[in-house]
């Protein structure tokens, strides 16, 4: 699912501002589409999950990647196999420590945001255990 929004910013965002913007936009998108946000920026040891949500009695772990341009590739391409393993490890701890059902889906929300437009792409089942 891809959405385009025409937004204009007078100055270029810092990487930190862009990351925060992307995570907030992803949360709004998920809520609008019927997801319950369970946790944001969940940390375990040195690992982090951007968003843990729930929909249709399934835990949905979401990695958000935001870039100002897709010139070197779409943001979702930055979720390497190593990063996937780290997210899975962290998600397993979250689920086991809360005695939640083991049915989990791993999604990526990929956002390109700049002064000309914002493009959001939600990739469901982007990777698996």
What are these regions (language model features)?
Residues 1-40:
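Acidic-basic catalytic patches of nuclease active cores, encompassing PD-(D/E)XK
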Residues 71-102:
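Mid-chain, well-packed structural core segment of small domains
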Residues 42, 54-55, 76, 92, ...:
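Positively charged, solvent-exposed patches that mediate nucleic-acid binding
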Residues 15, 44-47, 116:
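Short acidic/glycine-enriched loop/turn segments that link adjacent beta-strands
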Residues 5-11, 67-70, 124:
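Short glycine/proline- and charge-enriched loop/turn segments
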């Amino acid at each position: 699912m891809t959405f385009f929004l025409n937004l204009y910013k007078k100055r270029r965002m810092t990487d930190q501002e862009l990351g925060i913007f992307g995570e907030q936009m992803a949360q709004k998108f998920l809520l609008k589409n019927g997801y319950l946000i369970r946790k944001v920026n969940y940390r375990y040891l040195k690992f982090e999950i951007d968003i843990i949500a729930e929909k249709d009695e399934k835990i949905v772990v979401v990695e958000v990647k935001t870039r100002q341009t897709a010139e070197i590739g779409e943001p979702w391409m930055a979720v390497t196999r190593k990063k996937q393993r780290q997210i899975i490890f962290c998600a397993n701890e979250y689920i086991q420590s809360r005695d939640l059902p083991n049915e989990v889906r791993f999604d990526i929300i990929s956002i390109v945001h700049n002064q000309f437009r914002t493009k959001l792409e939600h990739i469901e089942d982007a990777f698996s255990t």
